[in-house]
Amino acid sequence: MIPLNRHGPGILLRKLKRWFEPDLDPQRVIDVFDEFDRARGYADWQALCRARLGRALPDGADHAPIVEQGYTTLPVMSAGTAAELLQAVGQDQEVARLKRDSAKLEGYQLDDPGLVSRLLDASLNPAVDAQALSFFRSEYLVHWYTLSRTAPSREPASVSFRWHCDKGPQSHLKLLVYLNDYDEHGGGTSYLDLAGSTAVSRTGYMFARGQRRTESLEELAAIAGTELKAYDHHPRAGDAVLFQPARVLHSGITPTRGPRYVLTLCLLPSPVPWREALALGMQIDLRTDPLWHEDARLLEKRLASTTG
């Protein structure tokens, strides 16, 4: 159900329009990126952030996996640390809805600033920082964060468990940190690299309505007219994937043995380091806020007002 607040009518209109979209529409990809990068000002925001970078890029930044491949896997914390953080978050909490316009995303509320800092400090380690810096060529901020719980099922938990890209600016990243082990839940995520995703993108498959997505890699390859090879990530507790969600096709692997717990961070370019941006309150709350800014260029004024 769509919440009856000031954002509700716009959400409803967008959902109704998508019912009448064609299944395959190459123009749709162009229109989506034009909306976010040009009309909503995310390209201008990125340029501003890059101009203010005050540290050197890592060696080999142009050839970092996140840049060339579109995703990279890396351990970010020990299994013991992952278990401790999950226990700290889950104690005295019931599973709750995490996103205002989705009943399918459930998990734990992250309302304790101290606990949020522990989670982010453990996740955004030097290896992740080097990849993010190579991709953005600027500092970055945490746009939003969730700790989700996906129950085991024989069927896909949501349309996120079909092949898709996430609508949004081209220059954003997601970091998925798995807090329990693949052996416990049997879940994960599959990825196509940038080359394979681009081949599919040319067909107009990207950004179609959720019910028009496919779970089948073979069907996706038939649409693209080329062989596709997916990477199936079977994470250990404490492992993470950093990827370009707007450009890399991905599909959740439904857990079958037990619940899967994932900390998800959405990263955007920033003119200041992420800890400073977090302290200034530059993040949004998915429970109450729209997912994306109407005009990202206004972020500069918001930042100035919090520091002035």
What are these regions (language model features)?
Residues S160-K167, R247-V248, G252:
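Histidine-centered catalytic micro-motifs
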Residues H185-V248:
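Double-stranded beta-helix
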